[in-house]
């Protein structure tokens, strides 16, 4: 197993005793209500998923990441982990203050020391991180709508986890717990699979091919904030469960969730996803076509080419896969490397196509989804899952 990024797994989660004392303390501090995606960031900082980060970035770190894809100390990092605040809050806060971060349910999430307050050039941020300044890009929209005032500093302790809706708590495992699980299984080579969609037949094929030379696979769906038209996390989890139970060797699969949010930053986010999975104990990660992409903002294999530039610093190794499809002649999943038949015989699968079918109330065919998965999706899409 690889060491965590930067060498040490961060842990900022309050013990039960600390939690009681700090919850009382939070009532005496300046209160800042933060959006769900920053609540997710608090958890990822505190549980070690964002190691070596121990808080929200200062201006120096944020600009270094935006411009040079590294922290100010030279360590590889691809996505700015920053905390935007409103102008009133920004003006009231002084460097050195302790503040209490609250979620929209009025729960204290974390106590933070303000080490920096600053502005950023948002056009430069978006151009470098997302390769576009187009407000229609979901990541750009988040950045630009959040404003240009930021505070940075260490998270002292995480007091409460984000509100979970519909997902069994057993799947919320912190990096230290996943690492322990992997160690107990005796796995040395672990491939991670990132997903924000139900696993269709093309995904299943790629995971199984990737698993062949490995000891185990970490199916690690992202359950933080995604696009409004993405399928909800609780529905996706049911799909993963039935797929693993019916079509995988259960002994070779680890299923848990990643409580991070999507940025849709394509090539840069591929690095971000790899570093998080390295912290969770993976040695390899599947990077497929248009990884963490959206629309037509990135090239099909741009993320794969991009991560190749950083393999020495990443340490976790990318497993790169071309597009796979169902071939009606082969009567099986295949890729251009393995299938001799013309394109007319290929049924190309994607999460986008599955979502479009579901919006129209159509059941995904067996070439797209396993029947058990299709049952769950069509029930959800037609409102019969209540």
Swiss-Prot record:
Any Gene Ontology biological process: hydrogen sulfide biosynthetic process
E.C. number(s) listed in UniProt: 2.7.7.4
Disulfide feature: none
Segments traversing the membrane: none
Keywords of this entry: ATP-binding, Nucleotide-binding, Nucleotidyltransferase, Transferase
Gene Ontology molecular function terms on file: ATP binding; sulfate adenylyltransferase (ATP) activity
Reactions this protein catalyses: sulfate + ATP + H(+) = adenosine 5'-phosphosulfate + diphosphate
InterPro entries: ATP-Sase_PUA-like_dom, PUA-like_sf, Rossmann-like_a/b/a_fold, SO4_adenylyltransferase_pro, Sulfurylase_cat_dom, Sulphate_adenylyltransferase
Transferase is among the record's keywords: yes
UniProt pathway: Sulfur metabolism; hydrogen sulfide biosynthesis; sulfite from sulfate: step 1/3
HAMAP family named in the record: Sulf_adenylyltr (MF_00066)
Record-stated family: Belongs to the sulfate adenylyltransferase family.
Name of the protein described by the UniProt record: Sulfate adenylyltransferase
Gene behind the chain: sat
């Amino acid at each position: 197993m690889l060491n965590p990024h930067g060498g040490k797994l961060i842990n900022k989660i309050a013990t039960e005793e600390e939690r009681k004392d700090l919850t009382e303390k939070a009532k005496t501090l300046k209160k800042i209500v933060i959006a769900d995606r920053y609540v997710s960031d608090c958890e990822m900082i505190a549980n070690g998923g964002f190691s070596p980060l121990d808080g929200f970035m200062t201006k120096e770190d944020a600009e270094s990441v935006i411009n040079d894809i590294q922290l100010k100390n030279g360590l590889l990092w691809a996505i700015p982990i920053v905390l935007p605040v409103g102008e009133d809050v920004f003006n009231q806060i002084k460097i050195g203050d302790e503040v209490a971060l609250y979620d929209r349910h009025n729960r204290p999430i974390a106590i933070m020391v303000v080490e920096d307050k600053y502005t950023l050039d948002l056009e430069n941020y978006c151009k470098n991180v997302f390769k576009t300044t187009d407000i229609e890009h979901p990541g750009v929209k988040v950045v630009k709508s959040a404003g240009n005032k930021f505070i940075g500093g260490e998270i002292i302790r995480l007091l409460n986890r984000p509100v979970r809706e519909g997902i069994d708590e057993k799947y919320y495992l912190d990096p230290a717990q996943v690492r322990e699980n992997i160690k107990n299984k005796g796995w040395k080579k672990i491939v991670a699979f990132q997903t924000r969609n139900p696993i269709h037949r093309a995904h299943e094929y790629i995971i199984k091919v990737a698993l062949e030379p490995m000891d185990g696979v970490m199916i690690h769906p992202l359950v933080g904030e995604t696009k409004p038209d993405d399928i909800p996390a609780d529905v996706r989890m049911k799909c993963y469960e039935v797929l693993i139970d019916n079509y995988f060797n259960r002994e070779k699969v680890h299923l848990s969730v990643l409580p991070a949010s999507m940025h849709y930053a394509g090539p840069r986010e591929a690095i971000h996803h790899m570093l998080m999975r390295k912290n969770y104990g993976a040695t390899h990660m599947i990077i497929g076509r248009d990884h963490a992409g959206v629309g037509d903002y990135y090239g099909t294999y741009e993320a794969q080419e991009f991560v190749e530039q950083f393999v020495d610093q990443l340490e976790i190794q990318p497993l790169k896969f071309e597009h796979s499809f169902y071939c009606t002649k082969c009567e099986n999943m295949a890729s251009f490397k393995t299938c001799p038949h013309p394109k007319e015989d290929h049924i190309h699968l994607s999460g986008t196509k599955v979502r479009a079918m579901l919006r129209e109330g159509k059941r995904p065919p067996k070439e797209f989804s396993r029947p058990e998965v299709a049952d769950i999706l069509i029930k959800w899409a037609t409102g019969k899952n209540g």
